[in-house]
Swiss-Prot record:
Residues 1-18, 83-109, 172-186, 317-338, 404-425 are extracellular. It is a multi-pass membrane protein. It comes from Gallus gallus (Chicken). Belongs to the LIMR family. Keywords: Coiled coil, Membrane, Receptor, Transmembrane, Transmembrane helix. GO terms for molecular function: transmembrane signaling receptor activity. GO terms for cellular component: plasma membrane. PANTHER family: LIMB REGION 1 PROTEIN HOMOLOG, LIPOCALIN-1 INTERACTING MEMBRANE RECEPTOR LIMR. Residues 40-61, 131-150, 208-295, 360-382, 447-488 are cytoplasmic. Putative membrane receptor. This is Limb region 1 protein homolog.
Length: 488
């Protein structure tokens, strides 16, 4: 008996060591990839003092950690879905014994823990540390900046906890719930993270439909469009003449007229960009022009249509079946049954749709006017803007598993703290979320595909000069002689 107990303890010990090793290796890979992504966009700093260089380096490491956690949260649900199918297909395979329910539950718990840590501690610390200068009267240095940062963090924590305490007390006036608020770890922080998750899902609800319609424009800019009834040689000739004319103007302007020089340089950059695109289209092969672009557009349309159909079916399931709710539906467990009707093919389709929704949400996020200034630029993004981008991506990625389960994209149950959010058990919130997503996505797609017809109707009616087009982003501005902007 003692030998058996020792053997069981050894197996548990080796299993835990193996899980920690796998988690560490996965996170190390994500951290390295995140570091290269951030350094690609981070502004190359000029010669700085040692103190500022250390502060920037610490903020960079914290931002990289947050971006790695965001990537882990995005991969969480796809990894769990594919792991469930692998365990069903090869239940006794020796080489996949490391892949088990304990590992997957541990990954979900770590993702939840690190998301809370980054959102409430690391990112506020990085921002305040970057902006701090030290209190007046204290000796300047790293210690003074750390002290100021810690004080700001304590004040921020008191403010946020006080707001959540008042909000929860107003929502639920029960005495028992008031007393439970004093239990910080068991109630307060999960309640706060539940609110953040709800905000993230609402942000996804706003960004994803916009991104789904915007994806067609983005892919159209990245791919080479078919040259139907277009003479690229003539366009190249015209662009070359424009470039030469602007270059002659720049050479003839004196150095004292700085405003005109700056405007002409901007026009020259735009012309060069158009010329580069035309050269790329001219060099593209026939199959790239005539096959790749239509195939990608059709693929995007199919993925978007499947997403909307799945949401529509999920609405019907919610009305007739209580197990369709994202909270409280006890699943069969990992490796016990397939959660997709079509088995491995259905699981692969779910994973593709989850990644597609995440990419669309990011595209939609940066397409919103309020977040346009957040768009990172290569080698020209400040550290403050990088922190803002990391926080935004973290909120979106942390809410992605919740949104995917709420919309019925997958039937995989949310594990860890992701499945304990109170609002997931509210039928009216979940149903309203599905209805709003389906309606907003449909409206955005209809608006996208009917914009060309609408513009032609406005031109035919002579109303195109009234600027009724609802796509001001695509219009170009040109300065007039009196300094005002004219829309072309």
């Amino acid at each position: 008996m003692e030998a058996d107990e020792v053997s069981i303890r050894e197996q548990n010990f080796h299993s835990q060591v193996r899980e920690y090793t796998i988690c560490f290796l996965l996170f190390a890979v994500l951290y390295i990839v995140s570091y290269f992504i951030i350094t690609r966009y981070k502004r190359k700093a000029d010669e700085q003092e040692d103190e500022d260089a250390i502060v920037n380096r610490i903020s960079l490491f914290l931002s990289t950690f947050t971006l790695a956690v965001s990537a882990g949260a995005v991969l969480l649900l796809p990894f769990s879905i594919i792991s469930n199918e692998i365990l069903l297909s090869f239940p006794q395979n020796y080489y996949i014994q490391w892949l088990n329910g304990s590992l997957i539950h541990g990954l979900w718990n770590l993702a939840s823990l690190f998301s809370n840590l980054c959102l409430f501690v690391l990112m506020p610390f990085a921002f305040f540390f970057l902006e701090s200068e030290g209190f007046a009267g204290l000796k300047k240095g790293i210690r003074a900046r750390i002290l100021e940062t810690l004080v700001m963090l304590i004040l921020l924590a008191l403010l946020i906890l006080g707001i959540v305490w008042v909000a929860s007390a107003l929502i639920d006036n029960d005495a028992a719930s008031m007393e439970s608020l004093y239990d910080l770890w068991e109630f307060y922080l999960p309640y706060l993270y539940s609110c953040i998750s709800l905000m993230g899902c609402l942000l996804l609800l706003l960004c994803t439909p916009v991104g789904l319609s915007r994806m067609f424009t983005v892919m159209g800019q990245l791919l080479v469009k078919p040259t139907i009834l277009e003479d690229l040689d003539e366009q190249m000739y015209i662009i070359t003449l424009e470039e030469e004319a602007i270059q002659r103007k720049l050479n003839g302007i004196s150095s004292t007229l700085e405003n005109q020089t700056v405007e002409l340089e901007r026009e020259l950059e735009k012309v060069k960009c158009k010329k580069t695109n035309l050269e790329r289209r001219k060099k593209a092969s026939a199959w790239e022009r005539n096959l790749v672009y239509p195939a990608v557009m059709i693929l995007l349309l199919i993925e978007t249509s499947i997403s909307v159909l799945l949401v529509a079916f999920n609405i019907l399931y919610l009305l007739v079946d209580e197990t369709a709710m994202p909270k409280g539906s006890g699943g069969p467990g990992i490796g016990n049954a397939s959660l997709s009707t079509f088995g491995f093919v259905g699981a692969a389709l779910e994973i593709i749709l989850i990644f597609y929704l995440m990419v669309s949400s990011v595209v939609g996020f940066y397409s919103l006017r309020f977040f346009e200034n957040f768009i990172p630029r290569k080698d020209d993004t400040t550290m403050t803007k990088i922190i803002g981008n990391c926080v935004s991506i973290l909120v979106l990625s942390s809410a992605l598993p919740v949104m995917s389960r709420t919309l019925g994209i997958t039937r995989f149950d949310l594990l860890g703290d992701f499945g304990r959010f109170n609002w997931l058990g509210n039928f009216y919130i979940v149903l309203s979320y599905n209805l709003l997503f389906a309606i907003m996505t449909t409206l955005c797609l209809v608006r996208k595909f009917t914009s060309a017809v609408r513009e032609e109707l406005l031109k035919a009616l002579g109303l195109d000069k009234l600027h009724l087009s609802n796509n001001p982003r695509d219009s170009e501005t040109k300065p007039s002689a009196n300094g005002h902007q004219k829309t072309l």
